[in-house]
Regions:
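Alpha-helical bundle/repeat cores within regulatory domains of eukaryotic proteins
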Residues: 154, 166-262
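Intrinsically disordered, low-complexity regulatory segments in eukaryotic proteins
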Residues: 1-206
Length: 262
């Protein structure tokens, strides 16, 4: 199936979306009684602090050998499929790893509510990154009036529905790219004014925006507060305690942004 199936792979991120092989692989694991081994590994990891996922990496290498996987893209598909199966099972056995209790969720929600009703001017957002008419508007209103920022907000809102880090980091990374494009469009429009409609969107996106880490981090934080995942604090704690699994630099970058934001 891995050889014959057509699949999508983002090589630079070592990511492949859920597909036919994922469906086949979970059946393969159950058929070969592989879930018992997964359960044993999960319970070992759960009782460790911080969570060391080296045993998951060893399991992945075992399946690479069993299935004789040598092609890089096939290895990526296998890693993503096993990660989804493994972390879904982890959540079934130990839902407390990412389930938020009401008191933590309530306090975090209040903080987010305060921030999303703040204005860019009130929290010292760099005026070069925003249209002048946005500076005195509550940030929640800015997001609702911008299709681009709504897209980023939706990517982040979806995080609470995932149990595995690869999909969490991919959606976070997608939101970061949207924020970057928003800033590029805003700074480009400031330079060309009403002539913005004369330029192709791809040209605007290719523009190099002069944006510091602090600038993009603050914008990302504010977008996150509009519709934050209900299990944000638990999610952050779990991701912070993970070790033993490697991700490509862009996804490690996304992890850093997400955990730091929460």
């Amino acid at each position: 199936v891995l050889t014959d199936t057509k699949y999508i792979v983002q090589d630079d991120l070592e990511f492949s979306p859920f597909g036919v092989f994922d469906e086949f692989f979970i059946k393969y694991i159950y058929y070969n009684n592989g879930m018992k081994e997964i359960d044993k590994i999960i319970n070992c990891i759960y009782n460790d602090d911080p969570y060391n996922f080296k045993l998951f990496t060893d399991l992945l290498m075992k399946y690479n050998r069993m299935l004789n996987v040598k092609n890089r893209n096939q290895k990526i598909v296998l890693k993503n499929a096993l990660m989804r199966i493994f972390f879904d099972r982890f959540y079934i056995l130990h839902p407390d790893i990412i389930n938020e209790n009401n008191s933590n969720s309530y306090n975090f929600g209040n903080t987010c509510n305060s921030l999303r009703w703040s204005t860019p001017k009130a929290i010292d957002i760099n005026p070069n990154l925003m249209k002048p008419e946005y500076m005195d508007k509550p940030f929640i209103s800015i997001v609702h009036s911008s299709e681009v920022l709504q897209e980023a907000s939706k990517e982040l809102q979806m995080l609470e529905f995932f149990t595995n880090p690869i999909d969490i980091f991919i959606h976070t990374f997608s939101a970061l790219k949207v924020v970057d494009n928003f800033v590029k469009a805003s700074t480009f429009e400031k330079r060309v004014g009403k002539f913005i409609t004369m330029f192709d969107k791809s040209l605007i996106i290719s523009e190099k925006a002069q944006m510091s880490f602090d600038d993009i981090f603050l914008l990302f934080c504010l977008i996150f507060t509009v519709y934050p995942p209900s299990n944000s604090k638990k999610l952050s704690t779990f991701l912070s305690k993970m070790s033993g699994i490697s991700f490509e630099p862009p996804l490690e970058y996304a992890k850093l942004f997400l955990v730091s934001t929460i």
